[in-house]
Amino acid sequence: MDLASLPPALKPIIPYLKQSQQLEKHDLLMAYYCRVHAIQMAMDIKQKMGASGSFLSIPIVKILDQGDADKAKLGSRLDEEDEAKYVEAFAMKAFSFADTQDRAGKANKATSTTFYSAFLFFNVLEHMGEVSEEVKLKKKYASWRSVDINTAIKNGVAPSPPPSIDQNEEGGASGETEEDAQLKQLEMELNLAKATLQQDNNNNNNMSSSTIITTNSVSEGMSSSLSFPSFPSIPNNNNNNNNTTPSFPSFPSFPSPTNSDNNSNNNKPAFPSFPSFPSPPTTTNSDSAPSFPKFPSTPSPTNSSSNNSQQPSFPSFPSFTSPTNSNNNNNNSQQPSFPTFPNSTNQKRQVFESDEEEEQEEVEDYSEKQQQKSTSSSFPKFPSNSHNNEYNQPPPPAYEFKQSPPQQHKQSPPQQHHNSHDNEALIKYQQQVAQQNLTIQKQKHQNQMLQDEVEQKQQQIQLQQQQLQQQQQQIQLLQKQIQQQQKQLMSGGGGGGNMSMNLNHTPSDTDKASAEKYSKWVISSLQFDDVPSAVKNAKLSLKYLTGEDS
């Protein structure tokens, strides 16, 4: 029986059941008595619990069944009259074994366990009837010594030696046994222990009363009889005998704040003065207002000639005189001289002038574009001079540039460079788009292939299902045929169909065994969907039963 499965309410009987299990192989009779004692304890527990203890019936019945089995094994060895003597002798034997080992100084954990087993055996003995004082004393001693040895082992300390027995002080008749002497010695030691405990209690009471009396007497005559050390007194200013009193360190004295003497300021402690901050300026006084830095004012375009010195100087450009000047001599001297072309026919001159006009238009277009770009970017503008209109002069007439046409101004517009970069970016973008389209087409193709594979697999699964259905139908037909044939065989009638039966054939035992074997093979073949093998085995089975081939 598994003791761990017992309910908690039956925990007190577990030690006795353990002893019973340990003694089954060595002493079945003592194991039986321990189990009977456990059953009696369980019945008492159930009776005390009343209706709530009904769940204990099942484990109690199991213990009873095991006790009945032991009782059947014992048979005539059970003797109700001598059972108490047997249990007492067994308990005394266990007690003496543990006590001998203990007094020899060999106490260990097994010694503690043996003392505890003897204690349990003494409990079994007490429930069988009245016991002697010797049994009661040994029961108590076994319980105490078991706990004492176990506690010492747990604490890592050597067990204390057992109480000694003085053989010279043993009294009584000469026929007194050694165990009786030990019990008397134990009684004497117990009495001595009680006496010492009582004496200690009396001494404690006397000590408490004496302390109360002494405290009262001390409180009454403290000044006369006892002298306690006094705390040092504060020195008196008028006392001239300073040597008798203890001196304490003097703290620095601070002058009183109400002293009217001007000279006392010298004795005061000097504290650091805080720096004085200037007072903020008043709003009424305009001169004391904070001054801010003045930035230089920009010259106005209508400034007089006297302010020209303050204006920023810019690099001077070559000045051209206006063509409308009244002084013809000065104009001839100031204007640049250009080489004159030789006179030619009017037809050649018109062709050349038309070419010059086209080139001039190209130059003007390019200059306009450059001006638009320059106006879009932020560059400093030069100040306009309203007095001298030299920079606003009209361009010279076209006939003055006939000799050297401004071919050097022909430049390819910078937009072509940007257009080339844009074209490269567009080409790259188109290539990326083409690659993406290719990858998308590949993915579509792969998806289509996967879909085709899935459809093919689905078709294969459908075909397999159809084949399975056909096989199942064939199996059902075969099973029906077999059942019909078995019915015909059982009824003793002739075989139907193409089967020929010999009614006079009586199968032997070997034929029956072979037929049974092949019929089992029919069932196993049908389980694995092997229809041909099932048909073959069925025919062989019928052959052994009927004696003829089908």
From Swiss-Prot:
The residue ranges flagged as biased composition, category Polar residues, are 340-349, 429-450
Among the Pfam families in the record, one is Vta1_C
Q: What membrane topology term does the record carry? A: Peripheral membrane protein
Q: Which domain of life is it from?
A: Eukaryota
Q: Which cellular compartments is it found in?
A: Cytoplasm; Endosome membrane
Q: Return the similarity comment.
A: Belongs to the VTA1 family.
Q: What does this protein do?
A: Involved in the endosomal multivesicular bodies (MVB) pathway. MVBs contain intraluminal vesicles (ILVs) that are generated by invagination and scission from the limiting membrane of the endosome and are delivered to lysosomes enabling degradation of membrane proteins. Thought to be a cofactor of VPS4, which catalyzes the disassembly of membrane-associated ESCRT-III.
What is this protein's record name? Vacuolar protein sorting-associated protein VTA1 homolog
Look up and give the organism this protein is from.
Answer: Dictyostelium discoideum
